[in-house]
Swiss-Prot record:
Gene Ontology annotations of biological process type: bone development; calcium-independent cell-cell adhesion via plasma membrane cell-adhesion molecules; cell adhesion; cell recognition; detection of stimulus; heterophilic cell-cell adhesion via plasma membrane cell adhesion molecules; homophilic cell adhesion via plasma membrane adhesion molecules; liver development
Organism: Rattus norvegicus
Protein name: Cell adhesion molecule 1
Gene that specifies this protein: Cadm1
Gene Ontology molecular function: any one: protein homodimerization activity
Family membership: Belongs to the nectin family.
Native organism taxonomy: Eukaryota, Metazoa, Chordata, Craniata, Vertebrata
Length: 476
């Protein structure tokens, strides 16, 4: 700002100021005040060479005041407080306040520090330069005071879902007034603020009306302060506690594939969450009674051996002190699956066995006497083939009627083996008897004295079979 300039011919005033500095302390102060009063009456002129800067400082920190001269002519510089009391005259400090310390003194600058700044130190400080004419400039010290206390208060410690609650935040004794911002989690909300001023200090109270939901349970409500004396984030917070009615969900735990058929087992589990935790979970069947074979165990519903009569809607109900809720499950029982056997390929190996059966035939000539004659052995392979063919036909018929039945095939094979063994046994026995058995007369004749005649009779019987008249009978 512009400084008052002394008129020409007033060098005596500067000399008087120098003399006042050398006078005793009590007289010195009076002379300086008189000199300053006289200088203030001098009209303003041009040629300002004295400069200062405003200072902003946080309470408790250090403020630096500097009086600078642009074009120095070795004139006297002094610093005064808002009450016009001299703090420093050149490098001399008349004021008995040790918080003021001289940092630099020269013909072009007077720099002074003020430690532990308080709100009472705020105001205008004057720099004076005793030139011809004298000059004066001032600097303003602004003291910032951060909030001394930050408090948040919730109307209700525990809220119920759907309620609207009041939350207040107070920032006390700040300068200037603070700005309060609200956050719920990461979402910013808008509140209403009121400011109270007392002794140049400000108290700000912000009110937030908040409607809570179950999702807000455990979410912090943050009161954040913005102030020039505060670096970073100054904030306080409270966590919401919201009670809400149960949330019910039904899970089918069996069968795992999710398809219910007749004869299957069936199980449902009811999951209920809430605040406070639900104290009662019950199962009911909507519009009908619960099946008698249904088993209820806490949150679980179990039905064994499902049938069509179990179709319907099953409801799980849960409740707490806030309220109750339910969830429904519609059961539909499907028909049991139809079992179709997979196609099988049966390979049948047919073995044809030709059996030759030897039958012993004894022919007795009815035209002769009672002596029998053995004509020989006759083989009838055709009869064996017919018998084998019948067995084979029966075997094939059995196989066609029992495709896929392994037991029947095994039994048929065993029977065939037994039949074959019996036929072989008959053949062996037939051959045996054919070789060792003759007629009664033949054996008796061979045992007598005239065995030779008996042999002749046998030969005649074998050789003369075509002519009955030539047959001769011998009686032994």
């Amino acid at each position: 700002m512009a400084s008052p300039v002394l008129p020409s011919g007033s060098q005596c005033a500067a000399a008087a100021a120098v003399a006042a500095a050398a006078a005793p302390p009590g007289l010195r102060l009076r002379l300086l005040l008189l000199l300053l009063s006289a200088a203030a009456l001098i009209p303003t002129g041009d040629g300002q060479n004295l400069f200062t800067k405003d200072v902003t400082v946080i309470e408790g920190e250090v403020a630096t005041i500097s009086c600078q001269v642009n074009k120095s002519d070795d004139s006297v510089i002094q610093l005064l407080n808002p009450n016009r009391q001299t703090i420093y005259f050149r490098d001399f400090r008349p004021l008995k306040d040790s918080r003021f310390q001289l940092l630099n003194f020269s013909s072009s600058e007077l720099k002074v520090s003020l430690t532990n700044v308080s709100i009472s130190d705020e105001g205008r400080y004057f720099c004076q330069l005793y030139t011809d004419p004298p000059q004066e400039s001032y600097t303003t010290i602004t003291v910032l005071v951060p909030p001394r206390n930050l408090m948040i208060d919730i109307q209700k410690d525990t809220a119920v879902e759907g309620e609207e609650i009041e939350v207040n935040c107070t920032a006390m004794a700040s300068k200037p007034a603070t700005t309060i911002r609200w956050f719920k989690g990461n979402k910013e909300l808008k509140g209403k603020s009121e400011v109270e001023e007392w002794s140049d200090m400000y108290t700000v109270t912000s009110q937030l009306m908040l409607k809570v939901h179950k999702e807000d349970d455990g979410v912090p409500v943050i009161c954040q302060v913005e102030h020039p004396a505060v670096t970073g984030n100054l904030q306080t917070q409270r966590y919401l506690e919201v009670q809400y009615k149960p949330q019910v969900q039904i899970q089918m735990t069996y069968p795992l594939q999710g398809l219910t058929r007749e004869g299957d087992a069936f199980e449902l589990t009811c999951e209920a969450t809430g605040k406070p935790q639900p104290v009662m979970v019950t199962w009911v069947r909507v519009d009908d009674e619960m099946p008698q074979h249904a088993v209820l165990s806490g949150p679980n519903l179990f039905i064994n051996n499902l049938n069509k009569t179990d179709n319907g809607t099953y409801r799980c109900e849960a409740s707490n002190t806030v309220g109750k809720a339910h969830s429904d499950y519609m059961l539909y029982v499907y028909d049991p699956p139809t079992t179709i056997p997979p196609p099988t390929t049966t390979t049948t190996t047919t073995t044809t066995t030709t059996t030759t059966t030897t039958i012993l035939t004894i022919i007795t000539d009815t035209t002769a006497t009672t002596e029998p004659a053995v004509h020989g052995l006759t083989q009838l392979p055709n009869s064996a083939e017919e018998l084998d063919s019948e067995d084979l036909s029966d075997s094939r018929a059995g196989e066609e009627g029992a495709i896929g039945a392994v037991d029947h095939a095994v039994i048929g094979g065993v029977v065939a083996v037994v039949v074959f063994a019996m036929l072989c046994l008959l053949i062996i026995l037939g051959r045996y008897f054919a070789r060792h058995k003759g007629t009664y007369f033949t054996h008796e004749a061979k045992g007598a004295d005239d065995a030779a005649d008996a042999d002749t009779a046998i030969i005649n019987a074998e050789g003369g079979q075509n002519n009955s008249e030539e047959k001769k009978e011998y009686f032994i």
